Amino acid sequence: MGKQNSKLRPEVLQDLRENTEFTDHELQEWYKGFLKDCPTGHLTVEEFKKIYANFFPYGDASKFAEHVFRTFDTNGDGTIDFREFIIALSVTSRGKLEQKLKWAFSMYDLDGNGYISRGEMLEIVQAIYKMVSSVMKMPEDESTPEKRTDKIFKQMDTNNDGKLSLEEFIKGAKSDPSIVRLLQCDPSSTSQF
């Protein structure tokens, strides 16, 4: 009986096959693990923050985890179901650079208006610094979240309107691998793209 519940139904599997980069076997394995960790089939923000904290034991990942959670929770119901989880995981782990950048843009665009303001960028950068600053030495021109935000805006805000469009964000990130690494919160990777 329990085994039947831990397998994806054929129509769900078909949907996920079409919307992710995972194989049927990988989807089934992820689903089993998801149900093991989330028996209700839904992940709350508090549960998500606890899981996320395991990946960043030397920093405070809670604020950044809230932003990631919001971006995973595409229907805005305050929980992440398996479909939301696996689609976001597919984009962030196996998606093409452009997909990852669109996903990152949606995380940085806190109010969903299609632009990233300086304040929105600063909020995310502050969350990243809280998470990694104890284990990462930042260059002098990025030693504070404010300096990092200013540097990003100088590089990306090509029309100087004080906000970043999706186009500016993607173009700017693609032209600076260090920004791509920061946006993906993967400071250890040096030549991912």
Curated annotation (Swiss-Prot):
Keyword Lipoprotein attached: yes
MF terms (GO), sorted A to Z: calcium ion binding
Residues that hold Ca(2+) 3 according to the record: D157, N159, D161, K163, E168
UniProt keyword annotations, A-Z: Calcium, Lipoprotein, Metal-binding, Myristate, Repeat
Keyword Kinase found: no
Binding site for Ca(2+) 1: D73, N75, D77, T79, E84
Domain of life of the native organism: Eukaryota
Pfam families, per database record: EF-hand_7 (PF13499)
InterPro entries: EF-hand-dom_pair, EF_Hand_1_Ca_BS, EF_hand_dom, Recoverin
Lipid-anchored residues (N-myristoyl glycine): G2
Cleaved signal peptide residues: none
Binding of Ca(2+) 2, residues: D109, D111, N113, Y115, E120
S-S bridge residues: none
EF-hand domain: residues covered: 41-58, 60-95, 96-131, 144-179
Similarity section: Belongs to the recoverin family.
Note: Probably binds two or three calcium ions.
Protein name as catalogued: Hippocalcin-like protein 1
Native organism: Xenopus tropicalis (Western clawed frog)
Lineage: Eukaryota, Metazoa, Chordata, Craniata, Vertebrata
Encoding gene per record: hpcal1
